């Protein structure tokens, strides 16, 4: 999940209250055989906030008015009252154009805009409105792709010095969070996510040899870290 701070108004006095809306997940899967999925928002703050939600296909700089997506979010903009919640419903309008033999990755954006406090508004204070934008992985999974839990076991690794190619022959996105020898010190410094039926190269802190068996940790649908053993080719 990535967070990006957006600044509104002029920076004269600092009065920011943001990041109070909690989302019920770190990633969202849309099964192809479902009519819709829901995302739960909770506002634990003592004041209401506005929340705007939209999907993008990987361009973090794209604005909602420039994005074409087959998904419909209801409501796209909502007021989330203090100590209350809001349900977002995401429905697929048409699956035309979406791959039927592998997953498609989108990103769910949530922009939280805190309100201006009443006395600040009345006194005409200049206020810094700090809006927090969060992005979550949103994956469309067509029906009939098989068992996602076993996908990481099908990864293959190809070494070239201190570089390692992670080959993903499955129809699923697989997030690799950690690569190590027997669960020891991590060899990778960043998380990678090889797309379905493709490969991605990651730099390692030390070279690995053909025939070695590495521990590969991947993130499952529920955000849990799962380790599998994979031999280097």
List where the protein language model places each region.
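N-terminal signal peptide c-region/cleavage motif recognized by signal peptidases
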Residues: 13-15
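Terminal connector regions
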Residues: 94-145, 149, 211-233
């Amino acid at each position: 999940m990535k967070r990006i701070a957006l600044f509104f108004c002029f920076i004269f006095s600092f009065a920011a209250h943001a990041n109070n809306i909690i989302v019920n997940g770190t990633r969202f899967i849309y099964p192809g055989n479902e009519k819709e999925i829901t995302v739960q928002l909770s506002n634990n703050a003592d004041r209401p906030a506005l929340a705007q939600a939209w999907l993008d296909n990987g361009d973090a700089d794209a604005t909602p008015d420039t994005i074409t997506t087959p998904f419909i979010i209801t409501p796209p903009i909502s007021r989330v009252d203090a100590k209350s919640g809001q349900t977002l419903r995401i429905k697929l309008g048409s699956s035309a154009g979406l791959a039927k033999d592998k997953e498609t990755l989108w990103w769910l954006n949530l922009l939280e805009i805190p309100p201006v406090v009443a006395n600040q508004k009345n006194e005409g204070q200049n206020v810094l409105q700090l809006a927090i934008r969060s992005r979550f992985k949103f994956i469309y999974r067509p029906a009939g792709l098989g068992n996602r839990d076993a996908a990481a076991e099908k990864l293959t690794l190809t070494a070239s010095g201190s570089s390692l190619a992670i080959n993903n022959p499955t129809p699923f996105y697989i997030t690799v969070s950690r690569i190590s020898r027997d669960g020891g010190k991590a060899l990778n410094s960043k998380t990678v996510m090889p797309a379905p039926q493709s490969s991605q190269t990651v730099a390692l802190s030390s070279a690995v040899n053909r025939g070695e068996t590495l521990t590969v940790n991947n993130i499952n649908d529920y955000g849990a870290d799962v380790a599998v053993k994979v031999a280097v080719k």
